[in-house]
Amino acid sequence: MTTPLTWHDVLADEKQQPYFLNTLKTVAEERQSGITIYPPQKDVFNAFRFTELGDVKVVILGQDPYHGPGQAHGLAFSVRPGVAIPPSLLNMYKELEATIPGFTRPTHGYLESWARQGVLLLNTVLTVRAGQAHSHASLGWETFTDKVIALINEHCEGVVFLLWGSHAQKKGAIIDRQRHCVLKAPHPSPLSAHRGFFGCNHFVQTNQWLVDRGETPIDWMPVLPAESE
C-alpha cells in the first residue's frame, strides 16, 4: 500500500533541524575551499528524486558514496554510464545472473531504471571527500538517513528491505517486521560475497513478495535512459 505523502511532506521539518543545516553548511564550505566532494551537489539527493516516498517498494541500503572520479551520482551501488562497474555491483549482477531467468550481465552500472521502479537506493552517508572513504561519516548524514528509514517504516506498507552487511543490518534494526519484509545477507563486496551473499536469492524473494501482494515485480535488468525510450 502506498502513501499519498511525499518526501517533502515528511522531511520538511527534518531539513530545518540544526544538525541537518550544519551538515549542508560543512559540505558547502568544503566544496568552496577547493576540496573535491562526491557526488556533485546536484546529485546528492537523487535517491529521493528518482523514487518518491509513495512509490517505494524496495530499499537497498548502501553506506558511503563511491569516492573515485565520476562514479557517484546519488544512488547507492550505481555508477554513471561509461564508468567501470564496481566490484560489489558486479557481484550483485552475478547473483542476478544465477537466479533471475533471462538476466544477462549489463556492460554498465547505471541503476536509475531500478530507482524509477520503486527501488530506493539509499546510501546512509550522502557525501564523501574524493579518495577518502568514510570522510563524511560523522557529519550528520547518518541521523538524517535514520529518520528516512523510520519514515518509510511508519508511512509505507509491505516494503522489502535488503540489508547487506552489518552496517545496513544495524541501520535496519528499527524496521517493523510485521509490516515489512526484511532480508539479510553478507555484503556483496568481494571481501564477503562468498560468505552468503552469493546464493541469498534476495532478488527472487523480493519479486515473489511483491507478486504475492499484487504488485508489479522489479525488472532487475538495468536499462540506460536512452534504451528505455
Curated annotation (Swiss-Prot):
InterPro entries: UDG_fam1 (IPR002043), Ura-DNA_Glyclase_AS (IPR018085), Uracil-DNA_glycosylase-like (IPR005122), Uracil-DNA_glycosylase-like_sf (IPR036895). Its EC number is 3.2.2.27. It is an enzyme of class 3 (hydrolase). Its main location: cytoplasm. GO terms for cellular component: cytoplasm. It catalyses: Hydrolyzes single-stranded DNA or mismatched double-stranded DNA and polynucleotides, releasing free uracil. Coiled coil: none annotated. One of its GO terms (biological process) is base-excision repair, AP site formation via deaminated base removal. It is found in: Cytoplasm. It comes from the Bacteria. The active site is at D64. Keywords: Cytoplasm, DNA damage, DNA repair, Hydrolase. One of its GO terms (molecular function) is uracil DNA N-glycosylase activity. Transmembrane segments: none annotated. PANTHER family: URACIL-DNA GLYCOSYLASE (PTHR11264:SF0). HAMAP family: UDG. Excises uracil residues from the DNA which can arise as a result of misincorporation of dUMP residues by DNA polymerase or due to deamination of cytosine. Belongs to the uracil-DNA glycosylase (UDG) superfamily. UNG family. This is Uracil-DNA glycosylase. It comes from Klebsiella pneumoniae subsp. pneumoniae (strain ATCC 700721 / MGH 78578). The gene is ung.
